[in-house]
Structures are given as structure tokens and as C-alpha cells.
Amino acid sequence: MTLRDTADQIIRASLRAVQPDAAVQRALQEFSCAGRVVLIAIGKAAWAMANAAWDTLSTRITSGAVITKYGHSRGPIGPLQIFEAGHPVPDEAGLRAAQAALDLTRGLREEDCVLFLISGGGSALFESPLVPLAELEDITSQLLSCGADIVEINTIRKRLSAVKGGRFALHCRPAPVFSVVLSDILGDPLDMIASGPAAPDSSTCAEALAVVRKYGLRLSDRALACLQTETPKALPNAVSRVTGSVRALCDAAEQAAQTLGYRCIRLTDCLSCEAREAGRFLAAVARTHASPSEPLAFLAGGETVVHLTGSGRGGRNQEVALAAAEGLAGLAQAAVFSFGSDGTDGPTDAAGGFVDQDSFAALRAAGLDPADILRRNDAYPALERIGGLIHTGPTGTNVNDLAMLLLPRRE
């Protein structure tokens, strides 16, 4: 079996283990409602979560809306309205979908209930902006390109929205909101996942303004005024349950690698750094442990960031892999792969990237300089050229990313 075959097996097994179906059904064992049940599902895993809820509750759900990324829905679900919208930058389709959700949850009684299914990507997909959409798109693009992490990004986005930062739960009053959350943020902070539409907000106006200063963001007077308006700090009508996170993804990958004969070392399930730094670190680990007496697998779960310096095509997981290529060159056998559990990496159709000990030479033979490619943020065409892209298609889940270093036993 090649290292690429091994990587593909681990990826498939990991993704199977973190599908939201069973987790949603377990969480719904705590759910009860005497009146109408309105289901609202947002995020990249919205369709799969809503489908699991429909399988569990069926006709108890009276109406609802499912809002997911383009290409991530899989057909009708009972009486639910299905919407697809833009991600990572919000668009008009997302605004129309959010308005439908607001309409469905307006005028509910105390005995009714909103079943709110939340997954990563919800920040862009579920939006009712307090500034013009064009300005929100510009601010989102600035945040995505400046190197801000997801907590900093969401601290800003909450205050520019009528549904984020706990404001959706306020809108639903007096009806209770029962949230089932698939976490894509390290530490599972409820107020940051999808920008916390049904969670009390722990961030402050001062923190939002500090992000503006740190990255030199260009904001209008209207947007700055929004950043100085505080968000709800208590929501007595809201209850949340986290059902999945990156730790489950790491557990599944570890088990899959062990089944294939590898001894696993989990470096972290809180990875948070520049993508290329993560790749270079994994390559350094490979050189330190080259030619081991037993197969070794080093894994790290979390979410890296990319500071855009070019206008190429790629994503953070592709940059993790590409940045490792030079450090693996010359080793007997070694591979690094990194992928997003949602099946997409940046604005591409790939989930991530794979490199091994021969990838650097293959890139140079093709006339490609990995350092220059990283400067231009153009990992996708380079990895495509050497067969290093990972394709899974939309997975129906979203619990961060996983990077892994494989070192077979010395022969």
C-alpha cells in the first residue's frame, strides 16, 4: 500500500466517524416541546443535521429552513425550505434565506420551540446585516485576507448583524431556542461558532475595536457605530448542546491509523498558526524521526490561517502540505497530508493536499518553485500538477481540519 493509499483510507474513516447523524439524534433525546416546532439549520452541515432531526422527530416538526453552502444540500426534507448561499463571503441568497428563517420564527408562543441546528460556515450563510451587503462583503474579505483568526473575525461580524451574537435568540422570544451545535472552533465556544446567533456573547466592543486597529481595517462610520453597540450577555430562553468537535475527528484518525499499523502521537487538537508554519513543523518532525523502527503517525487537529500576499488559488490545508514538501525531500519515505472535514479548502473544489518525499523534486522538475507558489498563495495548480490534491466532495460535516505526518517503518 502506498502512502497516498494510507492517507486516503485514514481520511475516509475519519469522515465517516464524524458524520452528524448519530450525534444529532443523541442530542435530541433531551428535546421536548408542547407546541409547534420550527427547525432552523445553518452551516455547511445544515442539510445532514436537519435530515437527522427529521428522521428522529418527523411530523413533530411543523416548518423550517435549511441554509447551507452552494452544492452542500442533497434534496428535499419533509416540509423544510432548502436554501443554498454564499460562503465564505455572504451574498444576496444568504440574506433571503435568513429573512425566511426570521419570518418562520416571528410571533411564536412560549409553548412553541425553535430547534436550531448550527454548524461551521453559519457566520456567512445566516446573515441579516446592519450595514449594506456590499460593505459587509468588503469587510469580510478584509478579515479573511489579513490573517485574522476565526475568533477575531467573528468578534467583528457579530456586531454588524441582526442575527449574530445572541440576537437571533432575542428575536425568537418568548419561544425557547434549543440549539444543537457541531463545533468548528477550538475549545467549542458557543458564542463564536457561527458567530453565536443563540448564545450570550462574551466578546466586547473594546475587543472588536482592537481587531480593527490590529489589522488596519477600513470601516465606514456606520460600521464603526455598530461595533460600539453591545451584544446580549444573557439569554434565558436559549439552551445549547455541543455534539461534535475536532477532538472526535482526531480520535477517528488516530484509530484508523492504528488499524493500519501506525503508532500515533497526537501533537495537538488545538492547532492555530500560519498554515505554512504548520507544514514546515511537520516536515521538521519527519526529519527528526526519519527511518523509525516502527510506523509512526503524528497528527494535529485545529484550524490554521493564511495571510494572503498573492492572488493565486488555494486554501490553508493545501498550503500546509505544500510547505512541508521541501523538508520531506531526501527522506526514505514520509508523507504529510492536511484536509478540511467539510470537504472544501478555501475557494476551491479540493479538501486539502498531500505531499511525500518525492513531491519537491516533482515540483522542481515541472519548473515550479514551492517558495514562490506560497508567496502567491497558488497551491492548488501546483498540487494539481503533481497529483497532490485531496478531493472528497461536500462531506455533510464540519469539525475543523486535520493534518497528519506518516513515517513508515525503516526497512
Predicted segment positions?
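Accessory alpha-helical/coil subdomains and C-terminal extensions
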Residues: 157, 175-178, 200-281, 285
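Internal gly/pro-rich beta-alpha loop/helix module
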Residues: 132-218, 227-230
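A glycine- and small-aliphatic-rich helix-loop capping segment at beta-alpha/alpha-beta transitions
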Residues: 52-61, 79-82, 102, 106, ...
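Internal helix-turn-beta structural module
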Residues: 322-411
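Active-site segments that bind and position negatively charged phosphate/pyrophosphate groups
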Residues: 261-338, 346-347
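Short beta-strand segments
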Residues: 40-41, 65-68, 115-120, 179-185, ...
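Glycine-rich oxoanion-binding loops at beta->alpha junctions
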Residues: 67-111, 152, 156-157
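N-terminal glycine-/serine-/threonine-rich phosphate-binding loop
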Residues: 1-38, 47-57, 88-110, 243-248, ...
